[in-house]
Structures are given as structure tokens and as C-alpha cells.
Amino acid sequence: MNNFLCIQKIGFMAKKEKEEMDKKIMKHPLIFCIAIITMGMLIFANPTTATEPVEQQGLVDKARVTFENFMADEQNFGEWFRKNLHEAKGLLIIPNLLKGGYIVGGSGGSGVLLVKDAKTGLWSQPAFYTMGSVTLGLQIGGEAAEVVMMVRTQKAVDKLLTSSFKLGGDASISAGPVGGGAKSNVMTDIISYSRSKGAYVGVSLEGAVIATRAQWNQAYYGKAVTPVEILVENSVSSPGSTKLIEAVQRAFN
């Protein structure tokens, strides 16, 4: 009986101490606010660290470097590239198209697509794409190639807004000219330009399958978003794409 009364007394004292502490906190708003802020910091500290689009931003930055390298070329190829750039309604830039050995097998890589607004002349935010399942008849060892595709027709732009399509089937494609004497009489929907080890090479991408990277688009823009929303409706944006867009915009000014 004595033990029971003792336990009751201890419980009553603990409860009273808690009530006294609560009263002190409520009487001092500053203490109360600090307590709430501290709890919030513990719960929500660094909420975006794990979801920062590091890979996606890296690809955007590499795409800018690739485009600037193509624009800065002082050989005949660069002159042809710059001369025909004004025809582009879209640009698909793949900084790292991987190939292996004597190309009789597959290759692939990821890239970003930007589309020009026909009314304003402004370029869109980048959307992420992947290209694969292509057979290339070119010996470049195990090196990677940089690729820039000029999308020249609205038909090709519309195909790129779908989930996937095949080059050469859904839209015609040809390799950009190499060396001097190249004529700007190409009539295909898309022209591809490739560079490996700093040298420009004619690479046929016919048969390649291009598909959207929905998860990368979501990671980069913070929500599920379609190519149409990114490229046409301009419903999302990222500060990380500013330098790439500015580099492309300068080329058309």
C-alpha cells in the first residue's frame, strides 16, 4: 500500500512539473518560437539534398560545351554548320554518344532537346532524351562522339514530342557534310553532325530510336512533366539551363 501511494505521488509531481514548464513556455513567446523552429529544422533539414538533379545538370552543362565547340570550329565544317543553323526548328544535343570497336553493333547516349518558338524566336527549356539501338558503319575505336542534330521540319519536331520514334522511319535524317565543298542542299527532316577526338566525322544515325527520359525530366523540374509542357507550353523552367539557352540564343541573334 505504501509503495502504491509512493508511485502515485511521484506521478503527480512529474505531471505538476510538466504543467509548470508548459506555463513558463507559454508565458515566454520567444522560447516557444525557438522550440518550434528547432523542431522544424530537425524535421525538414536539407529536404532536397537527396533529390538534387546532379546528373541531369551535368548533361545540360556538357550539352552547352558541345554546342559551343561546334559553333567555334574554324574549319569548313564549322562554317557550314553556322550557315545552316538558321534552318533549325529544334536542336538535339548528345554530348557523349558511346560506340565500341568497329561499329556493327549498338550505340547510345543521352541528350537534351531545345525547340524554337516560331513566333518569338526564343528557345525553350531543355527536355531529356535517350538514343540507342543504332548500327553505325564507322571505325572510331572505342571513342565517344559528340552529336548535334538540327531538327529542320515541324514534322520532326512533332515526332520528338511523342514518347519515342525511329530515325529514318518516322523522320528522315542525313549526316552533315565533312570537309570543304559541302553544299547546303540537304532536304531531310534532320541533319546530324558528329565529332570524335576533335575531328568531324560523318556518322549515319538512321535506324536509331529516340525516346524521352521521363524520370530525368521529372528530376530536373521537380515534378512529372511532358515534352510538350517543357518545349511548347514552357510551363516549367530551371535556372541551371540558363547558360545553355543563352548559348543557343546567341547563335541565332
What would you call each of these model-derived segments?
Residues 33-43:
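Bacterial N-terminal signal peptides
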